[in-house]
């Protein structure tokens, strides 16, 4: 975790009295911290997803899987709803309490959130082949890197686009809830296609917004917490874009 202490000199958030060079160095350290935390979250998610998949399934040959007792508990029992919904409660709590919690509490909450997402996303390993998951991941990573770079470097304000994309997220949620009852393949395809576009736009907007959050004269501790919150936003953009790409392009295992 020592990698995240590179804010120490110069300290970002020390106010506007610093030179332009110090501001640039502090901003760079702040953004590196954001991406480091995001990478940590993705690593935790991947490890937990793989561990849950390994413990929850057994290979019975010809690419077919059978569920273990643990697999039945997390994939085919009411417990799965707790696994799906608990990250939502945690992310709301983290966002609401960010200003008052300590850096260590914020960090631990983010790691716990990433672990819960990994447990939930392990179901994707049951449904889709490893090769198609890998392709979707690298496609999402390439798109994310390009869009985040654009959001960081562009001089154009993306706030209007961001507001529009947030309305799109609400639409995706409503459509997703509706499709839980309709089970429409066509509607699911449309939802996934729109999700790629929406979270691509949010990646650029969130990056610009996170960059702008830096210039606030905040304390050293608050800048650390802002970097964790920024990492959470970009983490969610990436995870949602990855899942949408996987649903569009993924190859399912033999049933």
PLM region descriptions:
Residues 1-255:
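A hydrophobic alpha-helical transmembrane-helix feature that marks the membrane cores
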